Amino acid sequence: YVDDPDDRGGATNWGVTQAVYEDFVGYKCDKEEIKNMDEETAKEIYHEKFWKPSRADQLPAEVRETYFDMVVNHGQGGAVKILQQACNNKRKPDNYIDVDGGIGPNTIRAAKNLKNWELQVERSGYYWNLVFKGSKYTQRTSQVKFIRGWIRRCFKL
């Protein structure tokens, strides 16, 4: 259980934020309920709220875990954009796929030969851009303290 005041996710247990938990159970809860969430409930939430809609099962086995972790941490649209950009890094400009955040047949086909390290590198670039390139974190210097953990996470999977 973590509840870092600088973490925009708020109270989190088993990687599930309070907002995601509340959406899953259909009611507002207190932090104590998040703290007491069991692992089985977290697994059920991951499966229903993230795995099923992500279409991760249609991607190559090599990138599934990293992609799924990105879906959990960046939302599906953000994760798909990172995936699409990683795919485009291997393609000629006249053969790029749209970086639109939608995981359709073109993205799934383009990811066919993607290596996990290629996706991890693109993801780490995403984090650096978030913190250091005038993004939504520009006025949130408190987020800088998370960059090392985010980058480590990129390459753990």
Stretches found by the model and what they are:
Residues Y1-L157:
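Cell-wall polysaccharide-cleaving catalytic domain and substrate-binding groove, primarily
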